[in-house]
Structures are given as C-alpha cells and as structure tokens.
Amino acid sequence: MIPAGLANPFAALFGGGTPIDFGKNFKDNRRILGDGKTYRGLIFGSLCGTLIGLLQILLAPHIAPYLAGFIDPSLLVGYSYIALITMPFGALLGDIVKSFFKRRLGFERGAMLPIADQLDFVAGAWVLTFLLDPEWLLANFTIWVAIAVILIIPVFHVAFNIAGYKLGKKDVPW
C-alpha cells in the first residue's frame, strides 16, 4: 500500500499546470474535477509511487530475514510489475473519481468528505489492480490485511495531509 499511499502526496507536491478536465464544466454547470487534478500531478504521482514500489521490491529480500518473527518473510519477496504500476496509478484514479462525485454533490475543491477522502485511493488502487492482476491482489490482501488497511490508512492519510498543509502544498489540512 505504500506506493499507493504516497502517490497522492507526490501528486500534490509535483502537481500543477493543466487540469485534467481542461477547466471544463459538466452538464450540471460545475467543474468536472477542478484545478486540483492535473496531468502533471497524475503523471508524477504515479511515477513516484511506482519508484517507491520498485525500491520496496529491491529492499524486500534484504529486510525479510529481520522480520521473520513478525510476519511471513515470503510475503515480502513476491511482487508484480503490473501491481507496481496499478497500485499508485489506481490510487490517483480513485481520487479523481471521488473528486468527480464531490463536484456533483456540490462540494468545492478542498471541502472535506470524511471516509471518502481517506479511502478513495485505497479503492482505486485495489479496483484497478484487481482488474489487471487479481491473483496478486488476492494473494497479498487477505480479508484481515484488507481490514487492517481500511482501519489504519485513515490515520496515515490525515497525518500526511497535515504535513502537506504545513509545507504549504495543501490549502486545507484534510
């Protein structure tokens, strides 16, 4: 989940430029996505998340022996190049889809929508990865791992958003 979780902060850090919706409105006369979803953010967020995943793959065999008493080390050495790309890219797609629906509901850019704001990237990462590499996803995200992710991720998400806000990369701390 680390590549997926870090894709969004990297998108915010390196984003800007041309909005994905090109500034266009939907048929409800509201922006399709808003200025916060840009091609540069999508590309660099996905790329940075993928590079973090690659770093995990390279380090896992060296770290696995030290975690033998805590987790099954074999879990750290199985990887998928498809998931390496789909997890961060899917995370950002999940955020984009959520933004589309927030605009339809009348939420402005930066407005808080609890739970959806914390788990949109998880849903996007899992859905895209399930569509393109279901075996890897189901082998790595058992029901208990999925529950742990759903419970733990919101805490990390809020912490990263507060950090982004304090660094001046986010307009709001959520």
Swiss-Prot record:
Coiled-coil residue windows: none
Record GO biological process: glycerophospholipid biosynthetic process
Record's catalysed reaction(s): 2,3-bis-O-(geranylgeranyl)-sn-glycerol 1-phosphate + CTP + H(+) = CDP-2,3-bis-O-(geranylgeranyl)-sn-glycerol + diphosphate
Keywords: Cell membrane, Lipid biosynthesis, Lipid metabolism, Magnesium, Membrane, Phospholipid biosynthesis, Phospholipid metabolism, Transferase, Transmembrane, Transmembrane helix
Pathway: Membrane lipid metabolism; glycerophospholipid metabolism
EC supergroup of this enzyme: transferase
Pfam families linked: CarS-like (PF01864)
Compartments reported by the entry: Cell membrane
Cellular compartments per GO CC: plasma membrane
Sequence similarity: Belongs to the CDP-archaeol synthase family.
Protein name: CDP-archaeol synthase
Species whose genome carries this gene: Methanocella arvoryzae (strain DSM 22066 / NBRC 105507 / MRE50)
